[in-house]
Amino acid sequence: MADKTVEDINQHAEGDFEVLVGNDVNGIGQRAMMNVLAKQATGDYIMKTDGHCSFSQGFDVKLLAEMDDKTILAPLLMPLDADNWAINGKKQMAQFVFDDNFVMQHAEGDVGETMCLQGSAWVISKENYFGWNVCDESLGSWGGQAAELGIAAWLNGGRCKTTRSAYYGHLFRHKDEEFPYERGEDPGKFATQELKRRYRNDQRILELRKKFGIDNKNML
């Protein structure tokens, strides 16, 4: 399916771009692989995408037109029907929060500033990618990136934001055989637990939760 994603990017991107594909044959994990690819990237901006996504026409130039040095930006998210390679436009997801266990939840609301991002596709400057330590390998190999993105942005004076100028479809996997890990050994659980250990009583997180209307009573 990664091949179809690359083909889709090549069909719909309109600017000056390069596609770097991570084939994690040595099992170093998604964060480590992202860091390897980010170091190889030659542009000023990096867009991370999962290998099972499709994109709207000109998504790259439209996203870059909205970028600044304080933002992690994501296109409007919709489910992808991978069998037909078609986007289900009836379910649009633009707002995301993380709960008191630092697990992402989809929230109601339109595009704009958001507490965090779903994590399957987003754009950041290369400088902020490394300066904010977006893919912190101490959080484990995979998972928990929604809260990680929100924390990295907001606690470094930046923000997370979604936009309607571009959109993408993402395959939401449900069956055990579709996941890149054993469901009983979910590395994402380590990531969210570690984020909770580090930040649960951080006043900046409490203020962030208040900003997005999240109850802080379970954080204390």
Model-derived features with residue positions:
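Long, compositionally biased intrinsically disordered regions
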Residues: M219-L220
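Catalytic cores of eukaryotic secretory-pathway lumenal/extracellular enzymes that build
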Residues: M1-N216
